[in-house]
Amino acid sequence: PNDKINPEKRKRPLASGKIKTPFAAFLLLFLLTVGLVWAYLLNNLFFFTLLGIFIISCLYSLFLKKILFVDIIAISFNFVLRAIAGAVIINVFISPWLVTGIFFVALFLTTGKRYGELEYLNEKSSEHRKVLKYYTKPLLASLFNIFAGLIIIIFAIFSFSSEHKYLIWAIPFFVYLILRYHFLISSNSKIARRPEQAITDLPLVIGTLIFIIISIILIML
C-alpha cells in the first residue's frame, strides 16, 4: 500500500524518507539471512515454517494483496504459520484448535482493519490499498459478523470438548471481548485500523484480564 497517502502512516521512517530504500533493503536481507540460518540451526521444521512465512509475505506484497478475499486469507494464514513456528520451537503439540482459532481470529481482525481503512480514507482508500476498491462496507460488515460468530462457536465447542469441564463458564467473558471489539470497529475507532492499539481501550483490557484470570481458575479446578 502507498503509505504516503495514509495520514496515519506517512510519518513512518520509509514513507517519510527518513530511512532510504537501499539501506532498508540491505537491513532486510541481512536480518533475513541471519534469522533463517539461526532457525535452521535450531530446528528444521522451524526453519521451513519461517521460510513459508517469508514466501507468503513476499507473494502478498507482490500480488496477493491486490486480490479480493485472497488478501485477508493470506494475512490470516501467515498468523497461523507464526503460531505453528512458536509451537515448534517450544516443542508443544500443534492443536487443531490452535490452527482454526488463530486463523479465524486473524480473519476477524483483518476484516475489521479493512473496514476501518475504508471508513477512514473514504474516496482515497483505493489509492492507499488497491484491493479496497473491491470491498464495500456492507460486505466487510457481513464478513466481520460471520467471523465473529465463528470465533465464538469455535471457543464454545473447544470449551465443551475440553478435558477442563468448567471452562464453559468462561464463554460469557469471551463473548464480551468479541462484542466489545465489534463495537469498536462499528464506531470507527482507530483500533479498527490499528489493532495493536486495543490496549488503549480500558473495557477491553479489563475484560481480557478478567477472562484470563477466570480461565486459569477454571482450568485449575
Give the location of each predicted region.
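Interfacial loop-to-transmembrane junctions
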Residues: 20, 182-210
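Multi-pass membrane catalytic core of lipid/isoprenoid biosynthesis enzymes
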Residues: 3-50, 96-107, 142-153, 203-219
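Small-residue-rich segments of transmembrane alpha-helices in multi-pass membrane proteins
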Residues: 73-89, 104-106, 130-139, 198-211
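Cytosolic, membrane-interface loops and tails of multi-pass inner-membrane proteins
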Residues: 1-16, 111-138, 187-193
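Structural signal for membrane-spanning alpha-helices in multi-pass inner-membrane proteins
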Residues: 35-39, 57-61, 82-90, 113, ...
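A loop-to-helix transmembrane entry motif
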Residues: 135-150, 167-169
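Transmembrane helix-loop-helix
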Residues: 23-65, 150-183
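Alpha-helical transmembrane segments
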Residues: 35, 92-112, 162-175
